[in-house]
């Protein structure tokens, strides 16, 4: 079973991915993990990717696709895989189809965990940290006993720049703009299944299982 998992930051994609790979016994393959493994392994493509990353530049598609090809050629993908964070563009999706064809494989399902951006903003802006001890809180999921104060040492909590509302909204806008052509691409191919992610985790996963079917 070969899957692509899509969803905005905070939509619960990681949670669903963990449940899928545990039940279906397929590897969870993220772009970051692939890059780190290639770099750690000192592969030619890994070295090439590192040279771009060290300069703060985007890794070109041809390098990324090469690393994806290497990863999907490994033995643990024989029964399937779950791709997370790749592809990000239609060009990458087309390249993925081509390389899978070369490997005698194809995408079975593209699962899009859909949650409205306005629901995601509070989830993504709710994290506050203690600058003294590093304790992490979330105003919805793990609030401190006293608002704005660390339970451990009484320090005033702070919010990282990445977690501020303006930054979060900008990041979501970019993700929505980038993902729309990809969603349209997979919808036209007939692979796309969009699930409502604004429900309890187990309810969403029940829909995922209904889509994917029983384990073999």
UniProtKB/Swiss-Prot annotation:
GO terms for biological process: AMP salvage. It comes from the Bacteria. It catalyses: AMP + ATP = 2 ADP. It is an enzyme of class 2 (transferase). Keywords: ATP-binding, Cytoplasm, Kinase, Metal-binding, Nucleotide biosynthesis, Nucleotide-binding, Transferase, Zinc. SUPFAM superfamilies: P-loop containing nucleoside triphosphate hydrolases. Residues 30-59 are annotated as: NMP. InterPro entries: Adenyl_kin_sub (IPR006259), Adenylat/UMP-CMP_kin (IPR000850), Adenylat_kinase_CS (IPR033690), Adenylate_kinase_lid-dom (IPR007862), P-loop_NTPase (IPR027417). It holds the Pfam family ADK_lid. Pathway: Purine metabolism; AMP biosynthesis via salvage pathway; AMP from ADP: step 1/1. GO terms for cellular component: cytoplasm. Residues 126-163 are annotated as: LID. It is found in: Cytoplasm. GO terms for molecular function: adenylate kinase activity; ATP binding; zinc ion binding. ATP binds at residues 10-15, 127, 136-137, 199. Zn(2+) binds at residues 130, 133, 150, 153. NCBIfam families: adk (TIGR01351), PRK00279.1-2 (NF001380), PRK00279.1-3 (NF001381), PRK14527.1 (NF011100). Monomer. Belongs to the adenylate kinase family. Consists of three domains, a large central CORE domain and two small peripheral domains, NMPbind and LID, which undergo movements during catalysis. The LID domain closes over the site of phosphoryl transfer upon ATP binding. Assembling and dissambling the active center during each catalytic cycle provides an effective means to prevent ATP hydrolysis. Some bacteria have evolved a zinc-coordinating structure that stabilizes the LID domain. Catalyzes the reversible transfer of the terminal phosphate group between ATP and AMP. Plays an important role in cellular energy homeostasis and in adenine nucleotide metabolism. This is Adenylate kinase. It comes from Exiguobacterium sp. (strain ATCC BAA-1283 / AT1b). The gene is adk.
